[in-house]
Curated annotation (Swiss-Prot):
Assembly with partners or alone: Monomer. Binds 30S ribosomal subunits, but not 50S ribosomal subunits or 70S ribosomes.
Family per record: Belongs to the RbfA family.
Transmembrane segments: none
Keyword line: Cytoplasm, Ribosome biogenesis
Molecular-function GO terms, alphabetical: ribosomal small subunit binding
Record's function text: One of several proteins that assist in the late maturation steps of the functional core of the 30S ribosomal subunit. Associates with free 30S ribosomal subunits (but not with 30S subunits that are part of 70S ribosomes or polysomes). Required for efficient processing of 16S rRNA. May interact with the 5'-terminal helix region of 16S rRNA.
Localisation per UniProt entry: Cytoplasm
Listed Pfam families: RBFA (PF02033)
A GO CC annotation given for this chain: cytosol
Protein name: Ribosome-binding factor A
Length: 116
């Protein structure tokens, strides 16, 4: 049952952070950033927030990471307003490489299909 609550809190934080990034954060470095997943620690003290950026450029990814780190305080404050939790978890932003990995596998499968 506790695991179900952790998953629900993670989904709610994902939804709220996406909304906050679109509506409240005015930093141009975080434009085009989408939250793909949130993994919560068991005690809900921290949340690892995975994100993707529309651009494939390494400089844009680095700028997005810096922009998210800079906006962490604003995001936590807005989460505190919108969520009914005793303590808002610390947010740790990490780039989600699963989409790029999936695209690479797709390209390899297409290349194999063309050869046969």
């Amino acid at each position: 049952m506790a695991n179900h609550r952790i998953d629900r809190v993670g989904m709610e934080i994902k939804r709220e952070v996406n909304a906050i990034l679109q509506k409240k954060v005015r930093d141009p470095r975080v434009e085009g950033v989408t939250i793909t997943e949130v993994q919560m620690l068991g005690d809900l003290s921290a949340a690892k927030v995975y994100y993707t950026v529309m651009s494939d450029l390494a400089s844009d990814n680095q700028k997005a990471q810096l922009g998210l780190e800079k906006a962490t305080g604003t995001i936590k404050r807005e989460l505190g307003k919108n969520l009914t939790m005793y303590k808002i978890p610390d947010l740790i932003f990490e780039k989600d490489n699963s989409i790029a990995y999936g695209n690479k596998i797709d390209q390899l499968l297409r290349a194999l299909d063309k050869k046969s």
